[in-house]
Amino acid sequence: MNTFDNLDFISEKLATQKRASPARSRQMIKRSKNRKSRVLTDEENRKFTKQEKKHLHKLAKKNAKETKDSGVMRKTCQRLDVSTLNVIEDDIYICSSDEEREDNDVASVLVEKPEPCGSGWVCDEWSGGYYWVQFYATKPDFKPNESGNWFFDEWDRGYYFSNF
């Protein structure tokens, strides 16, 4: 056999072979769009679980943000009535016996001494800092420090001493 005959033989052999149609090969590769109707490969399974985790994480993040926002809104919507929180009333006693009168005398002596009626944070407008102070119902006569003054709180919590 010469080379030409050999080429003819090879070309005939290739021409007579049955070729798979392109449509048929696509059909074998084609996957169903409904992923629940077939068994997933490991790669597809990983891909879908990763997508689901991302989606669940986004939902959880969104839900956490919504709950935080609703908590902030609830706190801002709740109005505190400062006048009821900081009511300082004189106690009125109706005494029926001498023992109760003695107790009331002791209580009135204790009330007359300047004692703190509460404490809280106060903002210094000049420096922008916050300071923890004690509030007094009435303006005391003493000064804890030489430098500083007594101020009445703008939220009606009482008098506080400030040296800032």
UniProtKB/Swiss-Prot annotation:
* Disordered: region residues: 16-47
Q: Which organism is it from?
A: Acanthamoeba polyphaga mimivirus
What this protein is called in its record is Uncharacterized protein L46
Q: Where is the composition biased (Basic residues)?
A: 27-38
> Superkingdom of this entry's organism?
Viruses
